């Protein structure tokens, strides 16, 4: 897409004829030293020593209160950090703050004083690309061991060089701080192999008696540089299998849609309406399966309920998994989406497939009523969740929390409605929000979202049943080899089961991305754990971790 086309089709064009980029550039004044045009947003180039001034102005005067993610990359002549900003109350209003730094001295101001979520995102940028961030409170590696040599996404990184890092060499600042001076506290390792972490997560915890006084999540045990793997694959054929492995529990189609949406907008591919309905139905089935396992494992964590809620939830999830297997041919790693549509039509005989879905939907209201009864009448669960793990809306926004974590704190934000895609804007459903801001509210959001997903699925089934046979077009006409224009950039996101799952792609004119960035909702949501846990008891911290519903494959990528 040419620059002229980008400007004429700019969704942020104002009635006065002044573009959104011009308006924001005028607001920032001399802070802006250049302009770029990304497909999703205007790009404002800022000096590396004026990042905080620019971000404070955009947040406080223009209302950009959501830092979605930070993309770092290396060019032949410079390094670059991109801060993807938007608003919780207007998701379609976006701006990219582009911060170039020199090859000889890749140092930039940290955004952490403005947005707390920049803490982990900038640590990841330093870890994988090598950019230094001044004023960062704790700039060290986050996904790789501290003793790792080089930065894997750098242009001169030697991928063939073997490296070994022992546990003894792995830095643990929290333990050192605890041991310094006189202290009555105790240091506890929770994980990396522990049932309550639901994956390979190391929660470094300092306690005073039974109360948590300090906490840090040590991640990266499942890191395999998925972004680099996607950069080595072709748009058309080789990238799509990877998203299934990020949130590998139940959210495969939701993950695939994140990549599909970004690549389709990048290459200007229009998906047929029939395929969009199939995508929407499949995505909501995945959402139900994901929320069911979140509900069951949360009850298991909080009061050891293995026989009732946990097994009931796993039973219902199993029914959904069987439906998804009928649809995609795979039980877990679906690889069902294709750029421009889906790989094949609904299974035959269609009547049996629809009947299986309807049977499950007919029994779902009674099942959810039983879940509600078991949860609201359980005194142990109520005591452990109501008023614990409190996350205020202001703190949640600063950390970039999204999905049920944000909506459980009263933040009315859902990309299916606020930046609609697929077939969601044609269907009747509601965004679920709870204002309790605690562990119980996050649990209720997921249970109520299952009801809304069921509404969406039923409407999709009704549409698909009556769809004329000669109009069942499952794929657009997509070139065998996709080569988007050089230096075309885009960030697109979908509403995953855990929150905002976003993809940034920069094209270089070849059939492979020059940069592929994954914005993981679990990565941002996990940052909030210390805010929810410090001052609470250890069992409450376990409940707070469970209420985040993280999957380590998506956190570590």
Curated annotation (Swiss-Prot):
Skewed-composition ranges (Acidic residues): 1-13
| Catalyzed reactions | a quinone + NADH + 5 H(+)(in) = a quinol + NAD(+) + 4 H(+)(out)
Residue(s) of cross-link: Glycyl lysine isopeptide (Lys-Gly) (interchain with G-Cter in SAMP2): 517
Naming one, the record's GO cellular component terms include: plasma membrane
Q: Where is this region: NADH dehydrogenase I subunit C?
A: 1-174
| Compartments (UniProt record) | Cell membrane
Question: Which top EC class applies here?
Answer: translocase
Keyword NAD attached = yes
Q: Extract the InterPro entries matched here.
A: NADH_Q_OxRdtase_suD, NADH_quin_OxRdtase_su_C/D-like, NADH_UbQ_OxRdtase_30kDa_su, NADH_UbQ_OxRdtase_CS, NDH1_su_D/H, NiFe-Hase_large
Top-level lineage group: Archaea
- Give me the ranges of the annotated region Disordered: 1-20
Q: Subunit arrangement? A: NDH-1 is composed of 13 different subunits. Subunits NuoB, CD, E, F, and G constitute the peripheral sector of the complex.
Identify its protein family. Answer: In the N-terminal section; belongs to the complex I 30 kDa subunit family. In the C-terminal section; belongs to the complex I 49 kDa subunit family.
Protein name per its UniProtKB record: NADH-quinone oxidoreductase subunit C/D
- Source organism lineage? Archaea, Methanobacteriati, Methanobacteriota, Stenosarchaea group, Halobacteria
Name the encoding gene, please: nuoCD
């Amino acid at each position: 897409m040419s620059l002229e086309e980008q400007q004429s089709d700019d969704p942020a064009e104002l009635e006065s004829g002044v573009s959104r980029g011009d308006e924001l550039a005028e607001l920032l004044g001399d802070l802006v030293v250049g302009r770029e045009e990304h497909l999703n947003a205007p790009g404002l180039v800022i000096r590396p020593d004026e990042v905080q001034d620019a971000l404070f102005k955009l947040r406080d005067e223009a209302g950009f209160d959501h830092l979605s993610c930070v993309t770092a990359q290396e060019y032949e002549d410079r390094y670059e950090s991109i801060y993807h900003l938007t608003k919780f109350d207007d998701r379609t209003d976006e701006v990219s703050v582009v911060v170039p730094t020199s090859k000889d001295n890749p140092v930039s101001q940290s955004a952490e004083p403005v947005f707390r979520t920049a803490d982990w995102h900038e640590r990841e940028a330093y870890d994988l690309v090598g950019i230094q961030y001044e004023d960062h409170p704790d700039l060290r590696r986050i996904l790789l061991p501290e003793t790792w040599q080089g930065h894997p996404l750098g242009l001169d990184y030697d991928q063939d060089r073997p490296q070994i890092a022992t546990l003894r060499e792995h830095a643990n600042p929290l333990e050192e701080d605890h041991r310094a001076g006189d202290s009555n506290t105790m240091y506890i390792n929770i994980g990396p192999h522990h049932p309550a972490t639901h994956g390979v997560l190391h929660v470094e915890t300092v306690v005073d008696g039974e109360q948590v006084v300090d906490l840090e999540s040590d991640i990266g045990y499942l890191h395999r540089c998925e972004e680099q793997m996607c950069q080595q694959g072709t748009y058309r054929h080789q990238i799509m299998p990877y998203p299934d492995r990020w949130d590998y529990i139940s959210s495969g189609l939701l993950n695939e849609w994140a990549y599909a949406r970004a690549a389709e907008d990048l290459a200007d591919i229009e998906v047929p309406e029939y395929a969009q309905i199939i995508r929407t139905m499949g995505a909501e089935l995945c959402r139900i399966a994901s929320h069911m396992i979140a509900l069951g494992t949360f009850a298991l964590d909080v009061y050891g309920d293995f026989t009732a809620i946990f097994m009931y939830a796993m039973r219902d999830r199993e029914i959904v998994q069987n439906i998804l297997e009928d649809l995609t041919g795979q039980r877990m790693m679906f690889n069902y989406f294709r750029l421009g549509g889906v790989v094949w039509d609904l299974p035959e005989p269609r009547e049996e497939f629809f009947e299986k879905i309807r049977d499950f939907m007919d029994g779902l209201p009674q099942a959810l009523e039983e879940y509600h009864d078991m949860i609201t009448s359980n005194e142990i669960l109520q005591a452990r969740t109501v008023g614990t793990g409190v996350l205020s809306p202001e703190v949640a926004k600063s950390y970039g929390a999204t999905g049920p974590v944000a909506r459980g704190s009263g933040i009315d934000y859902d990309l299916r409605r606020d930046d609609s895609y697929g077939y969601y804007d044609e269907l009747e459903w509601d965004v679920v929000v709870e204002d309790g801001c605690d562990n119980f509210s996050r649990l209720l959001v997921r249970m109520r979202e299952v009801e809304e997903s069921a509404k969406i699925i039923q409407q999709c089934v009704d549409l698909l049943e009556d769809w004329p046979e000669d109009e069942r077009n499952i794929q657009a006409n997509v070139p065998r080899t996709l080569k988007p224009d050089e230096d075309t950039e885009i960030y697109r996101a979908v509403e995953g089961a855990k929150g905002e799952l976003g993809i940034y792609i920069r094209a270089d004119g070849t059939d492979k991305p020059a940069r592929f960035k994954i914005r993981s909702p679990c990565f941002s949501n996990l940052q909030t754990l210390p805010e929810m846990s410090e001052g609470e008891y250890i069992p409450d911290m376990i409940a707070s971790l469970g209420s985040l519903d993280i999957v380590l494959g998506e956190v570590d990528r």
